Amino acid sequence: MIDSRHSRSLRSIILALLVPCVAFHVLAQQNEDEGGNDVQGNIDGVQIHRILPSDTDPRIRNYNGDGWFHWAFRSPGVADKGKLVVFLPGTNGKGKPPAAFSKMAAKEGFSVLGLAYPSLVSISTLDKSPDQSAFAKARNNIINAETPFGRFRTEQPDCIRSRLHHLIHFLAEHQPGEGWDQYLLPNGAIDWSRLILVGQSQGGGHALFMAMEHPVERVLMFGAPKDFSKFHHQPAAWYHRPSATPLNRLFSYVHRQDRQGCTYPEQLENYRAVGLLPQYTIVNADESQPPYGGTRLFTATKPFQKSKDAHCYPLFNEVNIPVWKYMLETPID
């Protein structure tokens, strides 16, 4: 049981997460006396933990507290699929995954993590760089703490790979009955084959970059991948790298009015660089039903006045739940 104070706090968190895209910029106010303790509780059948990053690794000093938290979702009463959904938020995201998506995934039997990582600098600030490897250097720095580049100076304890490793170990140790240890190999390394990497905007690009380095179960990109060089008038060079994860395990959903990072025609060039076009047909999610012809690419045409609203629509509007379920669960040959 959780006390009424924690119950009220959890419900305020869920309400805040349900506000489209605001979850990436505005945090629900937390009681200061909660300190570094992880908020725990069961909301609508979903067990939720909020974890202070430094509790998982004492070396962590940055992007820690003051809104920066890791999150974990799971449904105890649902058959465990043995797959871990790892959510990487976009620029200025502080770790909280979208509530509707996370609760849906948990109720489908997935374990879900939201990771707090260094996300304050937009990757799109590099789109005018003459360095064709600029996008890759920045992402490699954030993910692996390698290749310091410009404003990207990630310390090793703060990089995505290290934080994810320590978070899974922390949950396996402190929540031993929840099955987090199944996502670790006998030697303690992450079992990438069980991971589904999900990212929005900047986080979607990180998910793809990581999938090229590690063979993951699948990748879900929302409002991504967006790395397009305005200087060279072409997609990021790293899209052409060999990938450890096959093409048929990559999914993307970008609204046609989304101009964040790149225009929609430039988005299509990114798909071609990755290889998703012409391999797959782009399906309009607003006008289609599962199984969507087996595609890996989605768009939408619901009109918006602002590009940012279109950018958020694929992952922050519950009308897309059928698409989310398809992307998570459609069989892969």
Segments (PLM) and residue ranges:
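Alpha/beta-hydrolase active-site loop
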Residues: 133-187
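Short amphipathic alpha-helix adjacent to the substrate-entry channel of hydrolases
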Residues: 99-114
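The feature captures the conserved acid-bearing segment of alpha/beta-hydrolase catalytic domains
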Residues: 72-76, 217-312
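Alpha/beta-hydrolase fold nucleophile elbow
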Residues: 185-199
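Short beta-strand element of the alpha/beta-hydrolase
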Residues: 82-90
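Gly/Ala-rich beta-loop-alpha elbow adjacent to hydrolase catalytic centers
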Residues: 198-203, 207
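N-terminal cap/lid segment of alpha/beta-hydrolase-fold proteins
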Residues: 30-78
